[in-house]
């Protein structure tokens, strides 16, 4: 049985996002951290970082943590956001991966480029570290597009295997988006941090984008297009302002 297009794309977003996230967000982050430690020089080697590790040491636990959070979780969220916003990104053609990655940097860059993270003080120069971590976002977007397209095509075969993979992808999407929304709205009852607010914004955008896509032909009308682009621009401005503020504080 052929899987509906939107369902396939949601599943493909989860699966391709995790794969690319593990490589770029997980292993890529580990590489950036290693380069940061080398660039900082011998004077900081052995100093304890904000996550409890020591500068210059590569631990199995730390690497697994990066792969799970920076790879599996962040990758799945990024892949689902791409699936949700795919119609809006299509107009950029072959540049859509780069545009998505840069947009993701604006929206969620503050999750990584956090001025409260003391590592940006310990590891110098800060400009190099900010640039390397920021570069991971467009790399993720560029790498995601071809993997996503191939995954969507593979899930369209109608076989038992493709159906099983689609089921896994949908289950991951429901789990992550559900937990993300519940956690985010629960945080609103107290004093949410900027990280919690941006995370909630990402999940709301995923849900809203998929809901808008489910409306089908209504999305093609001029009023709907203008409204949705306006909402996307507003969300991007909010996230980008927060990211830019964090970068300025790190560099100064």
Map each language-model feature to its residues.
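Juxtamembrane/disordered regions of integral membrane proteins
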Residues: 1-252
């Amino acid at each position: 049985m052929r899987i509906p297009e939107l369902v396939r794309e949601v599943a493909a977003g989860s699966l391709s996002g995790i794969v690319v996230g593990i490589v770029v967000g997980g292993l890529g982050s580990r590489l950036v951290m290693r380069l940061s430690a080398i660039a900082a020089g011998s004077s900081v080697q052995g100093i304890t970082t904000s996550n409890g590790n020591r500068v210059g040491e590569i631990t199995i636990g730390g690497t697994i943590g990066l792969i799970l959070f920076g790879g599996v979780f962040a990758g799945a969220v990024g892949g689902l956001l791409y699936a949700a916003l795919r119609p809006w990104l299509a107009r950029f053609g072959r540049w859509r991966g780069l545009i998505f990655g840069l947009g993701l940097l604006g929206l969620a860059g503050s999750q990584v480029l956090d001025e409260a993270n003391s590592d940006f003080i310990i590891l110098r120069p800060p400009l190099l570290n900010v640039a390397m971590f920021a570069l991971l976002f467009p790399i993720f977007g560029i790498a995601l597009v071809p993997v996503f397209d191939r995954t969507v095509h593979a899930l369209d075969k109608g076989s038992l295997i493709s159906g099983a993979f689609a089921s896994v992808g949908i289950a991951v999407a429901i789990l992550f988006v559900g937990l993300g929304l519940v956690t985010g709205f629960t945080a609103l009852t107290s004093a949410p941090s900027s990280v919690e607010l941006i995370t909630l914004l990402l999940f709301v955008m995923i849900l809203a984008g998929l809901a808008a896509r489910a409306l089908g032909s209504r999305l093609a009308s001029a009023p709907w297009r203008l409204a949705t682009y306006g909402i996307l621009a507003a969300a991007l401005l909010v996230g980008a302002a927060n990211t830019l503020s964090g970068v300025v504080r790190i560099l100064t």
